[in-house]
């Protein structure tokens, strides 16, 4: 009976995956010890989503929010509250992971984590229609690497630090 139950469970999970019910966000574990490994998984989710037609299978900046440091999480929460108040799009009007709104990723290169004590940086280079560079700044909190800031280094307004943008935004509008 157990074998039948296990087979039924496996079949259900497989069909849910085929239907796009299992969201991409759940697939990038926040427990990865190396921040570069985690970032590779995040960008792989975007690659997979390009091939998926399911809206439930689309990655989002929520992947970063789940792994944000306490200070960055507070800034993300402030921005989310602004959106929830019906003010439309607030500080973040694009997906900073891919440095755009639409994406066609190629040549994704996640560099190694450069660790100095309880801080680390990881540089990600990729093409999203044009060449892009994002630098992720991590801090160790509660024994885990957390994203403390992201700096997009491409485009006419570069560099753009996400933490600074969230801090400086006029939420009274």
What do these predicted regions represent?
Residues 1-11, 15:
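Bacterial N-terminal signal peptides that target proteins for export
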Residues 15-24:
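C-terminal segment of classical bacterial N-terminal signal peptides
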Residues 25-29:
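Boundary of Sec targeting at the N-terminus
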Residues 31-51:
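Short, aromatic-enriched amphipathic alpha-helices that serve as compact interaction elements
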Residues 35-39, 60, 68, 162:
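Stable alpha-helical elements in mature extracytoplasmic
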Residues 65-130:
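Surface-exposed, charged secondary-structure patches
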Residues 114-119, 123-135, 149-173:
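Low-complexity, intrinsically disordered terminal/linker segments enriched in charged
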Residues 135-146:
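A short, surface-exposed beta-strand/turn
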């Amino acid at each position: 009976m157990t074998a039948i139950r296990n087979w039924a469970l496996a079949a259900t999970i497989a069909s849910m995956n085929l239907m796009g019910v299992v969201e991409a966000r759940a697939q990038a574990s926040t427990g990865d010890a190396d921040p570069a490994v985690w970032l590779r998984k995040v960008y792989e989710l975007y690659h997979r989503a390009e091939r998926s037609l399911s809206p439930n299978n689309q990655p989002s900046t929520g992947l970063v929010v789940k792994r944000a440091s306490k200070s960055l999480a507070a800034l993300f929460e402030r921005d989310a509250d602004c959106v929830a108040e019906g003010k439309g799009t607030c500080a973040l009007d694009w997906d900073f992971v891919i440095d755009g709104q639409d994406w066609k990723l190629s040549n994704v290169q996640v560099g190694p984590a450069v660790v100095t004590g309880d801080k680390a940086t990881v540089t990600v280079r990729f093409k999203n229609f044009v060449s892009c560079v994002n630098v992720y700044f991590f801090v160790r909190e509660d024994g885990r690497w957390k994203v403390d800031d992201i700096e997009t280094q491409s485009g006419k307004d570069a560099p753009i630090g996400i933490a600074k943008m969230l801090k400086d935004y006029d939420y009274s509008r």
